[in-house]
From Swiss-Prot:
Transcription factor that binds specifically to a 5'-AA[AG]G-3' consensus core sequence. PANTHER family: DOF ZINC FINGER PROTEIN DOF1.4-RELATED (PTHR31992), DOF ZINC FINGER PROTEIN DOF3.5 (PTHR31992:SF111). It is found in: Nucleus. One of its GO terms (molecular function) is DNA-binding transcription factor activity. This is Dof zinc finger protein DOF3.5. It comes from Arabidopsis thaliana. Residues 82-94 have a biased composition (Polar residues). A zinc finger (Dof-type) spans 25-79.
Length: 247
């Protein structure tokens, strides 16, 4: 009984398979019989859709043939092998960069230290350096440091320049080889070429704004008495410097 049922089922199945094989038509484009049924268009049993494996194109029974290029009806999404290879290399590189497989580790201690001790901005440091340089140039326009020894040399040279005009004027005040008057002994120089103490004391009392030429006064003759003779005029109270004017 069971065997008879099996034979009946197989007998029923085979005609259906043969019917499907007979229903599948050949390709209207290339005439190949290597075709297969795909689906019903718009779920309508009157519009079965087939696919030809020879020309790799679709068609619908009872419909018009469209000018579909060869292979245009294939629904397989083909991806180029080069892109897949590039994706594989990219994934391998990413995995080698992160051996742990997770996000990169962050040193919390370093982050906290940077938060407590922030680094100064480079632009602020450069601005401070420029301000310091500007202040230095304002204080010292020549841009050179004043060495004490160099400044002393300048003072010595200025002192010599200050004395030389006085010496030249005194030499011009000579009286053609005549012996000096008693007051002119103050103008004598010592063996080292330095003025006597009395002249230097008088020189110190000269104002800063007075030039060396103005500091030396012209000889002034003081007449003690109109009745005195010529000897009193020469050797009396005559002096090349008017010391009373300084007082």
């Amino acid at each position: 009984m069971e065997r008879a049922e099996a034979l009946t089922s197989s007998f029923i199945w085979r005609p259906n398979a043969n019917a499907n094989a007979e229903i599948t038509p050949s390709c209207p484009r290339c005439g190949s019989s290597n075709t297969k049924f795909c689906y019903y268009n718009n779920y309508s049993l009157t519009q079965p859709r087939y696919f030809c494996k020879g020309c790799r194109r679709y068609w619908t029974k009872g419909g018009s043939l469209r000018n579909v290029p060869v292979g245009g009806g294939c629904r397989k999404s083909r991806r180029p092998k080069s892109s897949s290879g590039n994706n594989t290399k990219t994934s391998l590189t990413a995995n080698s960069g992160n051996p742990g497989g997770g996000s990169p580790s962050i040193d919390l201690a370093l982050v906290y230290a940077n938060f407590l001790n922030p680094k100064p901005d480079e632009s602020i440091l450069q601005e401070n350096c420029d301000l310091a340089t500007t202040d230095f140039l304002v204080d010292n326009p020549t841009g050179t440091s004043m060495d004490p020894s160099w400044s002393m040399d300048i003072n010595d040279g200025h002192h010599d320049h200050y004395i030389n005009p006085v010496e030249h004027i005194v030499e011009e005040c000579g009286y053609n080889g005549l012996p000096p008057f008693p007051g002119e002994e103050l103008l004598s120089l010592d063996t080292n070429g330095v003025w006597s103490d009395a002249l230097l004391i008088g020189h110190n009392h000269v104002d800063v704004g007075v030039t060396p030429v103005q500091a030396v006064h012209e000889p002034v003759v003081h007449f003690a008495d109109e009745s005195n003779d010529s000897t009193n005029l020469l050797f009396g109270s005559w002096s090349p410097f008017d010391f009373t004017a300084d007082g």
